């Protein structure tokens, strides 16, 4: 039977099988860095390969059944069944072949900063921190707090954390695939604990998310001459000294002006390594934004730029309501969302993004 051959899927299968062979070689499996890179690429190809193998098996079985259909009615019946299954398998393969964000399988660095609203904004930033930590826990991800500046009332002025999956997840299961939509301004409406008149106050917190670079990521190279490194004493809430050693690190990338501070690790060496990894992650995100802009892919650029001024979500406590302003998602389970039941909200963003990618793909065909 005449059928599209999907050369892109065939190429993906060949690369996937080549990676399998490489991962069986001692010089590769004995090198954790190479194994991690190959494992991530294999996971990226896995969705396409699985869909292609399913489609290919159905098509080949259908060809064989149709050849025998004239001699055996059982084969004729089997051919009808396979023929009915082929369109769905083909559609799943076409969907798998739609270009994804190449960073979907990566882990992330997330920053939460209290906005206008004083102590109430800091308390809300703390609520967001707990929400993301609970969500990560439900997904089986690990969270590492890299730096935190808290208030005396338990709020958070700013916090930075790494959220990491276990192993090599498929792109759709990657941390970045879900949390990249969280960047922007989150607005809260509630009666502050410091409000004696019972009036509802509006305040906000900003969330910044970017994919985490690998320690040995060769996509980004940093010249040591481009770094200015300052060492200072770690501090806790209200400027209290955490220890008596100068272990905190402030790293400035001179060409871009990006500044990264790290103080939560136990030693200066560990803080320096952690700061360098965050800096590489920021530069990687900047590089991908520039590439998206040069390719004139404005939708992709808008997703990746994570505009700090964009109000993306409102959390209304009196009505127990949450609204995502990009997708018009609305639900009255704010208490559950703040306890980490965030998937339905994120799914609305993922669905909207997939619809845009599909529409863009169809326009190009």
From Swiss-Prot:
One Pfam family from the record: RF-1
GO cellular component terms given for this protein: cytoplasm
Maturation and modification: Methylated by PrmC. Methylation increases the termination efficiency of RF1.
Key words of the record: Cytoplasm, Methylation, Protein biosynthesis
Gene3D superfamilies listed in its UniProt record: 3.30.160.20, 3.30.70.1660, 6.10.140.1950
Superkingdom: Bacteria
GO molecular function: translation release factor activity, codon specific
Sites of N5-methylglutamine modification: 240
Location relative to the cell: Cytoplasm
Presence of keyword Ribonucleoprotein: no
Keyword field contains Transcription regulation: no
PANTHER family documented for this protein: LD18447P
NCBIfam families referenced in this protein's UniProt entry, alphabetically: prfA, PRK00591.1
Described purpose of this protein according to its UniProt entry: Peptide chain release factor 1 directs the termination of translation in response to the peptide chain termination codons UAG and UAA.
Family affiliation: Belongs to the prokaryotic/mitochondrial release factor family.
Protein name, per record: Peptide chain release factor 1
Record lineage: Bacteria, Bacillati, Actinomycetota, Actinomycetes, Bifidobacteriales
């Amino acid at each position: 039977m005449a059928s599209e051959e999907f050369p892109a899927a065939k190429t993906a299968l060949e690369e996937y099988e080549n990676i399998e062979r490489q991962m069986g070689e001692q010089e590769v499996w004995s090198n954790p860095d190479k194994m991690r890179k190959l494992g991530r690429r294999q996971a990226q190809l896995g969705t396409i390969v699985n869909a292609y193998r399913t489609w290919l098996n159905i098509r080949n079985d259908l060809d064989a059944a149709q050849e025998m259909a004239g001699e055996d009615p059982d084969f004729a019946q089997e051919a009808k069944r396979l023929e009915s299954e082929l369109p769905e398998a083909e559609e799943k393969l076409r969907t798998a072949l739609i270009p994804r964000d190449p960073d979907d399988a990566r882990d992330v660095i997330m920053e939460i900063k209290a906005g206008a609203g004083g102590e109430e904004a800091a308390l809300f930033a703390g609520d967001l921190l707990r929400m993301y930590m609970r969500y990560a826990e439900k997904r089986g991800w690990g969270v590492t707090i890299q730096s935190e500046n808290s208030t005396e009332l338990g709020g958070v002025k700013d916090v930075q954390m790494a959220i990491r999956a276990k192993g090599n997840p498929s792109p759709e299961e990657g941390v970045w695939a879900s949390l990249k939509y969280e960047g922007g301004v989150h607005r809260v409406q509630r009666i502050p604990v410091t409000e004696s008149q019972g009036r509802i106050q509006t305040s906000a917190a900003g969330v910044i998310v970017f994919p985490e670079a690998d320690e040995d990521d060769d996509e980004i190279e940093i010249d040591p001459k481009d770094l200015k490194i300052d060492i200072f004493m770690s501090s806790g809430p209200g400027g209290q000294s955490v220890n008596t050693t100068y272990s905190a690190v402030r790293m400035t990338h001179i060409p871009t002006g990006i500044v990264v501070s790290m103080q939560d690790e136990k030693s200066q060496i560990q803080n320096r390594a952690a700061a360098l990894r965050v800096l590489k992650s920021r530069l990687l995100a900047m590089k991908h934004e520039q590439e998206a802009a040069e390719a004139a892919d404005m939708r992709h650029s808008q997703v990746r730029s994570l505009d700090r001024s964009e109000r993306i979500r409102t959390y209304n406590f009196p009505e127990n309501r949450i609204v995502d302003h990009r997708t018009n998602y609305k639900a009255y389970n704010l208490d559950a969302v703040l306890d980490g039941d965030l998937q339905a909200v994120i799914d609305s963003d993922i669905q909207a993004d997939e619809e845009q990618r599909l529409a863009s793909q169809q326009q190009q065909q």
